[in-house]
Amino acid sequence: MIESVIVLLFFMSCFFLVFQLADNLRAKLLCEYAAGRCARAATIGLNDYMIEKTAHVATMAAAGPCRTTDDRGGTVGYRSWISRAPDYLECVYDAQARQILDFDYWRDGRTTASARLSGARIEATVIQRRPQLFGPAMLFAGPAGDAEGDPGDATLVGTATIEAHYPDWLE
């Protein structure tokens, strides 16, 4: 009986480890995708706030629970996320944007985006801080945390570089 419990705990620990690693890999891929979208947004001259919103929309699938409520007070579902994304991108003010879409990892600067012109290139970076699971999965997941975040946070960074042709045309 004890052996069965030990084996069950071992398999559950292995499952949670693989689940956490897969979730972090998915979030890392979405950060890379978001960085590419932010770099494209910067090439057409969008400001920093629009680049940040572009990163938010690109990382919706890995942004944690949705905090926006619908008209009846319930949480907004996946189909509503997709239909609300254009309205979110059109918002001018942050308070208005949070009424349309708001996720856990968008709050408190957990998902940030930046783009800068470097010579003839635009380099975009998307950073997302995500909480790590504690317990056996944390032993195998590697170091977690950074100087700015909680010690239980993992920092995922996505970067992209795109050639900037607009300086040639706008001179």
Per-segment meaning from a language model:
Residues 44-171:
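Short, conserved structural patches
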Residues 1-68:
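Alpha-helical assembly-interface signal, strongest on the long, hydrophobic N-terminal helix that forms
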